[in-house]
Amino acid sequence: MVVKFTKSEALHKEALEHIVGGVNSPSRSFKAVGGGAPVAMERGKGAYFWDVDGNKYIDYLAAYGPIITGHAHPHITKAITTAAENGVLYGTPTALEVKFAKMLKEAMPALDKVRFVNSGTEAVMTTIRVARAYTGRTKIMKFAGCYHGHSDLVLVAAGSGPSTLGTPDSAGVPQSIAQEVITVPFNNVETLKEALDKWGHEVAAILVEPIVGNFGIVEPKTGFLEKVNELVHEAGALVIYDEVITAFRFMYGGAQDLLGVTPDLTALGKVIGGGLPIGAYGGKKEIMEQVAPLGPAYQAGTMAGNPASMASGIACLEVLQQEGLYEKLDELGAMLEKGILEQAEKHNIDITLNRLKGALTVYFTTNTIEDYDAAQDTDGEMFGKFFKLMLQEGINLAPSKYEAWFLTTEHTKEDIEYTIEAVGRAFAALANNK
């Protein structure tokens, strides 16, 4: 059991003097779980972390999803080391980027052409530009609660109604940009239709997380994605899948392969980099030919397609091609789900658990979670207490009630068994303090 965070606390105090908020991404702070110093990690191996105080954790954060093969996987580490020895940045075409592009196309047939960038935010941002160039329209639709990166183009919240033009969700985002975004509830065909009836003639594209990962793991209702394609295409707009979280996480070919629905454009990131910074986007040939140097939609990047990220990504996909890997993730996920639900019943703790294969979210509520409104209406204070109890048990989770638990290929049944026991102790403590 973890008992001290002395060095993490000291390091955070020092970080506050030099780094904004002491963190380089706000999701890493503990603000959403009651505050305190975030735990600083020193090294990772397989399914485990060790912090600066020497405490060991079973990791279910997985860097918010990318580390599907576990930390410091030897095949990926070797590829990165070799790339570093050969020079990590050229500013020229390489054989590695061609090989990796071919691998992505083979995995995801909807990608006639691809282009590499440096992050999921960049990938989404550019698909929007390409969609606007192709359609000649300006408005974008998205689903409430679905995060598509921190660019001005999509950092908006829903208004008071389902088809209301967006309002900025961050200082510094001009109202003029936010007004180009229309937000509708996920899993609701009727409100989508209403919005398209009103704004469809101005809409360039709709951004879709085919399986939601940013207000927990939420699957689309049967037939929902098919209806999205139908309605959006009828309006003359494009369908963009944001598979930054989902690609290669639930199935090798991404959510579009798992669900059997094809988008016009796809944004990728996270898993495809094997832990290094990366993004990619692609889609139908006639749409992608809008991108410079072939077309008028400009996109460039000094670091785009750098050899280190290409080598890491290739190695990661090679690992993910191993037979039985996704079946193992599903099996461990089912085992963890069953154990958590049993512990909740045993200790009379109200939870709803959403799981798809090797990813799940525990919500402190009895309500079904199918959209963002339902996810918001869950007990964040209870989650914060649970999070810190699990940290004391040596279990590393994301510090937010909206985030998923991600399994890796390196988790074992013994890890799951210990985690279930730890959940039981945490639930017992919560029950005693009700």
From Swiss-Prot:
GO CC term, one of those recorded: cytoplasm
Swiss-Prot/TrEMBL GO biological process terms: protoporphyrinogen IX biosynthetic process
Protein's pathway: Porphyrin-containing compound metabolism; protoporphyrin-IX biosynthesis; 5-aminolevulinate from L-glutamyl-tRNA(Glu): step 2/2
Modification type N6-(pyridoxal phosphate)lysine: residues: 270
Keywords: Cytoplasm, Isomerase, Porphyrin biosynthesis, Pyridoxal phosphate
Gene3D superfamilies the UniProt entry points to: Aspartate Aminotransferase, domain 1, Type I PLP-dependent aspartate aminotransferase-like (Major domain)
Domain of life: Bacteria
Subcellular location: Cytoplasm
Principal localisation: cytoplasm
Name of this chain's protein: Glutamate-1-semialdehyde 2,1-aminomutase 1
